Design a protein with these regions (language model features):
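Single, function-defining residue in the core of a domain
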Residues: 1-63, 77, 82, 100-104, ...
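Short beta-strand scaffold segments in enzyme catalytic cores
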Residues: 132-136
């Protein structure tokens, strides 16, 4: 008598498993007590699809389409059904940005973080959609921790409230004693934000515009930052009061690097124990987030995505959240010792250093090339499985860094 094949319900999931998908599912389902199982499954499938696409070497202008992503989903269904599955995931109202922040923190830092690290917040525009990104510095790039996408015309109250809430949501996922050192650009130099961060005990560093008015200690007449005299190569530090009415006490660090068009005016909470040199070094890392935005738009092909409707921002947010794990894995692949062999094989270095390096390929590019070049793909696949096993044990991607970020020893005088 022939064995009858089990009859599958029409709506049953027909998943095409392999070692990579099993490891992805095992890693993500370990967090099923925090996040719905259906959401974790969809993130695993999208991660698998994007890694599959990485096996074809992508150029700097490689655009990505939702149709290409849907074709690579590990589902034993037709192309139309896979597209519908992807679209249902992007329209899932239960997938809010804040519920995945703890997962991203655990994947980036591990579950036993004991050091304070630099964290950057900045904003960019993707296809007309405003995008906020918070991430940790890693090998000249940023490990994504939190995203928030929005349309300016649809903001109900204030973008300032959205930014502050995103900062709080990210910071709340870290132990109090090792909360990251937040690095901000000039657009965030608001006294209201500084007061909030001080009251909440969150360390920060923010660059200010030269037109900002400050008051030196013991003086009643204020002056703009641009009126402070400084020569190229100099580094100065002052105790100041920020804002004419609030008079928020801050430390001002002015640095005029050689070859710079204008000085940096950096503000930190009053009494910060970091030296002026260390503060300047930390702010210099802010360029990492610009490189991170370029990665998402070009190497990952996000700028090629098209979303229709009056408010496409939530769908872009969910897709970026789903892309985060594949981005973390490719960064890790490009920052191992084995990646140095790939770099020597594919990279043509600059004759003159640019931004302090002669490299022309980022760790993300090296990670993607490891997957796509036949000469290195087998070893890269094994390393990928090994990374997923370590992530499942509570390790973080940041531990694969060849030159791990130095911990910030910080204390504030009360």
């Amino acid at each position: 008598m022939k064995n009858k094949k089990p009859h599958l319900h029409p709506n049953a999931e027909r998943i095409e498993y392999d070692d990579l998908l099993r490891k992805l599912m095992g890693l993500l389902l370990a967090y099923r007590g925090m996040i719905r199982v259906t959401i974790l499954k969809n993130i695993a499938w999208v991660t698998y699809a994007l890694i599959t696409l990485f096996h074809g070497a992508r150029g700097g202008n490689g655009w990505l389409s939702k149709a290409a992503l849907a074709r690579c989903l590990p589902l034993g269904t037709g192309p139309k059904e896979r597209e519908q599955r992807l679209y249902r995931f992007l329209d899932n109202m239960r997938l809010a940005p804040e519920i995945l922040i703890p997962l991203h923190v655990a994947l980036a830092c591990g579950t036993k973080l004991r050091e304070r690290l630099p964290m950057i917040l900045d904003q960019t525009t993707i296809r007309g959609i405003e995008t906020l990104l918070i991430g940790l510095v890693f090998e000249g790039r940023v490990l994504p921790i939190a995203f928030s996408c929005f349309m300016k015309k649809l903001i109900h109250k204030s973008q300032n409230i959205l930014e502050h809430c995103l900062i709080l949501a990210a910071m709340s996922c870290f132990p109090v004693e090792v909360r990251p050192f937040l690095i901000l650009d000039r657009g965030y130099a608001r006294v209201a934000l500084f007061i909030h961060l001080r009251k909440e005990g969150l360390p920060f560093l923010c660059r200010a515009k030269k037109s900002v008015m400050v008051y030196l200690s013991g003086q009643t007449k204020g002056q703009t930052l641009g009126r402070f005299k400084i020569k190229p190569g100099q580094l100065l530090r002052y105790s100041v009061l920020y804002h004419s009415q609030k008079k928020e006490p801050l430390d001002l660090i002015i640095y005029f690097g050689k070859g710079y068009q204008e000085p940096w005016y950096l503000l930190v909470p009053s009494g910060t124990s970091l030296t002026a040199e260390k503060i300047v070094e930390l702010y210099a890392k802010r360029m990492s987030i610009e490189q991170g935005f370029r990665d998402w738009k070009t190497h990952l092909g996000v700028r090629g995505l098209v979303f229709y409707g009056d408010n496409p921002a939530p769908r872009l947010t969910r897709l970026l959240l789903a892309f985060s794990l594949s981005y973390l894995l490719c960064l890790a692949l490009g920052s191992t010792e084995e990646a140095l062999v790939v770099r020597a094989f594919v990279e043509i270095e600059r004759r003159k250093p640019r931004h302090g390096t002669t490299r022309t390929l980022s760790v993300l590019s090296i990670g993607i090339l490891r997957l796509s070049l036949k000469k290195f793909s087998k070893q890269a696949y094994q390393d990928l499985l090994r990374m997923l096993r370590r992530l499942s044990r509570g390790k973080g991607v940041i531990q694969w860094c060849l030159s791990p970020p130095k911990p910030i020893r910080l204390s504030l005088k009360r």
